[in-house]
A protein has these predicted regions:
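Catalytic nucleophile loop
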Residues: 87-89, 108-132
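Short gly/pro/ser/thr-enriched loop/turn and capping motifs at secondary-structure boundaries
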Residues: 93-94, 125-128, 212
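Glycine/threonine-rich flexible loop motifs
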Residues: 92-102
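C-terminal and late-domain segments of enzyme folds
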Residues: 1-26, 38-53, 133-134, 138-311
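Portal/gating segments that form or line small-molecule/metal binding sites
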Residues: 31, 37-82, 87, 94
């Protein structure tokens, strides 16, 4: 399960609930890996409390800070014990560099191969694919040299995943990478939106936003010859915008079915506490691009100025 970040943690918690259900419900054994995050114990505590609120009896943390720690047997044993592994947000380059090819990373891959659900939000979503977005600039227009790729864990072959897709204007950088590697299917996840992949090719969309897919196997592009920061020429790309309830076949890259399941019963969850809400907001803002932060600050200043000018 790959989540676009900022998943609902205080309301119906539709995505996290589904993750718990796939992990075994009340019998689930969930390992939370917060290696990507700079928030440390705070983010571990958040997800431990969230999963406990959702009825999970056993939640443990595995947070190797580097490859040496990721090679410790205790972390590999945790992945072998789990019925669900969850990667938090943060920095996907930090996460991949720390765990890929280590005992812990290999144990997560082995767990996935035997049917354990592996999920991640934000940076944790990017790392599930073989090729992932390492870093890049926001913007709607695909340009040469606006993004760099890196290796992920390889749980989803043939795709490349980006997150916070609409909210952080990452259309251009995903298009850029797929134009350069047209055999890959580009998948952009909006916030509070996820994909659940079963049987290797059956993709289901869960959440309130959309999932953007781009297929360039038959498209025309000048990505191989572009120079500098020039805009790319792309013609004939296949695109899909998939909302909640859509099912998509990754092998044929076609829509299988669509049934809207927007209405969600929030169940009998207790009301979130103030500190839980505060931590959730801090987690949601982690990893925001500097340009987005600056733009939001300018917008707030303009709004304040307009209020002052109003009679």
């Amino acid at each position: 399960m790959a989540i676009g970040g900022a998943e609902d943690k205080l309301g119906a918690t539709r995505i996290l609930r589904r993750f718990v259900a796939e992990a075994g419900g009340s019998d689930a054994r969930i390992v939370v890996c917060a290696t990507a995050s700079a928030l440390g114990p705070e983010i571990v505590e958040l997800y431990e409390r969230l999963f406990t609120r959702l009825g999970v009896a056993e939640v443990v943390s595995a947070r190797p800070r580097d490859r040496r720690e990721a090679d410790k047997q205790e972390h590999a044993d945790a992945a072998a014990w789990a019925t669900g592994v969850f990667f938090t947000g943060g920095n996907q380059m930090k996460l991949s560099a720390a765990i890929r090819g280590t005992r812990f990373g290999d144990a997560v891959v082995a767990a996935y191969d035997r049917g354990v659900i592996v999920g991640g939000t934000s940076a944790g979503a990017s790392v599930v694919s073989e090729h992932m977005v390492g870093y890049g600039s926001p913007g709607a227009q695909p340009k040469f040299r606006m993004v760099a790729a890196a290796q992920g864990l390889g749980l989803l072959p043939g795709v490349i995943v980006d997150q916070h897709f609409s909210q952080r204007e990452r259309f251009g950088r995903l298009i850029n990478l797929v134009a350069s590697s047209p055999d890959l299917l580009g998948i952009g996840l909006d916030e509070d939106t996820s994909i659940l992949v079963t049987d290797e090719t059956d993709l289901e969309v869960i959440g309130k936003g959309s999932v953007f897919c781009v297929d360039m196997r038959t498209a025309l592009t000048d990505a191989a010859t572009a120079r500098g920061t020039a805009p790319l020429m792309i013609s004939g790309a296949g695109v899909h915008f998939l909302p909640n309830g859509a099912r998509f076949d990754l092998a044929s890259r076609t829509l299988v079915s669509y049934r809207d399941h927007s209405a969600v019963d929030p169940g009998d969850l207790p009301e979130p506490t103030h500190d839980l809400a505060t931590i959730s907001r801090r987690v949601a803002s982690e990893g925001v691009d500097d340009s987005v932060v600056a733009r939001n600050a300018r917008r707030r200043r303009r709004t304040k100025a307009q209020h002052k000018e109003s009679p």
